[in-house]
Amino acid sequence: MSTHTARRAGATAGHDRDRGTEPGRTEFRRAMGLLPTGVAVVTVGSGEQTEAVTVGSVVSVSLDPALVLVSLGSTGRLVEAIDRAGGFAVNVLTTEQSDLSACFASHDRPHGRGAEERLGGVAGASGHVLLRDAVLSMECRTEHRYPGGDHVLFLGRVDELHTAEAAGSPLVHHRGAYTTLKDPC
């Protein structure tokens, strides 16, 4: 339950903004942190051309055709790399890969061969690095690119799908920290 004080008549707990007032960047970021998200590393290229970044915004868009959406900061190296390559790979991390998430979320993350070595992956059929122990890896071809405020949204057609049934639990980010899914039993 929120500790905010309601500012308008009829406001409910946690809903304290006057109508028409947009949230600030920090407030919106904190609010979105309440939404648990899976954690993935998006990769482009391999070898000297490897670029990678951690994302918490991967969305299944369509089953037929298989489409996913990823959201990337518009000023990042990965946007240009995807534009050049015409595609990307999405690697959903396990709880044992939180170190990779932290590494590729930093501004001084490795790229080129250093990124490929740190990821410990192999190039897939698309030429993009796939993480060996990821819960799921998808090789995608860019279908569309959309501006989205300070981000770019890439809609990717999934050409190759790699699942690791024996992989550990997926890494989850919630309230600014990594967490795990609880076993329902």
From Swiss-Prot:
Keywords: Antibiotic biosynthesis, Flavoprotein, FMN, NAD, Oxidoreductase. It is an enzyme of class 1 (oxidoreductase). Residues 1-24 are annotated as: Disordered. It comes from the Bacteria. The keyword Oxidoreductase applies. One of its GO terms (molecular function) is FMN binding. The keyword Flavoprotein applies. It catalyses: FMNH2 + NAD(+) = FMN + NADH + 2 H(+). Does not interact with AsuE1, suggesting a possible transient interaction between the two enzymes instead of formation of a stable complex. Belongs to the non-flavoprotein flavin reductase family. This is NADH-dependent FMN reductase AsuE2. The gene is asuE2.
